[in-house]
Structures are given as C-alpha cells and as structure tokens.
C-alpha cells in the first residue's frame, strides 16, 4: 500500500488465474476529471498523475465510488492460456 506525494492510495496487488489486479483511490479533485461514460487509456490515467509500471489496463469504474479506479494486467503465464474469440476484454463502467 502506497500513498504518493499526490495523495493517491495504491492497493496491494492481488490476482486470480488470469489477471493481476490493483485499485487506486484518487483525490476528489482528480475524480472530477475522470470520464463518466468510458474507460481511460494509459496515457489518460498517467496524465492524471497515476504512476504504475507498464501494462496495467483501466478496466472498470465502480459507479458509487468514482474515485476508485480498478486496473488489471494479464499474468505472464495466463497470456498463453486465455480463451476467447477475440474482441476486447474490457469490463467497463458500472
């Protein structure tokens, strides 16, 4: 758990069989800048001051707590075994 100089809270990482996850709590001022109807690209969330290693994907916003951003990235071994018929694996805004 880390709180940077920007007062963001970074959760510990956790995982399932396919992904590594973490969530980031941003300040109320930054939360106002988050798009309401779509997920952000890595360039967008980095421009808000979120700092993480490459490969993290913003995959969900929890509607009641818009200041909590959820990120995931495939586990190295899971990339070989992920099933699906193409398309995007983005979950979206809830």
UniProtKB/Swiss-Prot annotation:
An annotated GO BP: regulation of mitotic cell cycle
Assembly mode: Forms a homohexamer that can probably bind six kinase subunits. Interacts with cdk-1.
Organism annotation: Caenorhabditis briggsae
Name the record gives this protein: Cyclin-dependent kinases regulatory subunit
Role according to the record: Binds to the catalytic subunit of the cyclin dependent kinases and is essential for their biological function. Has a role in the exit from M phase during early mitotic cell division. More specifically, thought to act by the degrading B-type cyclins that causes breakdown of nuclear envelope and exit mitosis.
Protein family: Belongs to the CKS family.
Alphabetical list of SMART domains matching this protein: CKS
Intracellular or extracellular location(s): Nucleus
Primary localisation category: nucleus
Keyword Heme: no
UniProt-recorded Gene Ontology molecular function terms: cyclin-dependent protein serine/threonine kinase activator activity; histone binding; protein kinase binding; ubiquitin binding
Keyword vocabulary terms for this entry: Cell cycle, Cell division, Mitosis, Nucleus
SUPFAM superfamilies reported in the protein's UniProt record: Cell cycle regulatory proteins
GO (cellular component) term, any one: SCF ubiquitin ligase complex
């Amino acid at each position: 758990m880390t709180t940077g100089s920007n007062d963001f809270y970074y959760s510990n990482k956790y995982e399932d069989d396919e992904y590594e996850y973490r969530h980031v709590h941003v300040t109320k001022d930054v939360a106002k800048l988050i798009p309401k109807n779509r997920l952000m690209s890595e360039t967008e969330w980095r421009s808000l001051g979120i700092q993480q290693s490459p490969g993290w994907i913003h995959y969900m916003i929890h509607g009641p707590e818009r200041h909590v951003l959820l990120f995931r990235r495939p586990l190295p071994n899971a990339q070989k075994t992920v099933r699906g018929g193409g398309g995007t694996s983005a979950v979206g805004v809830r």
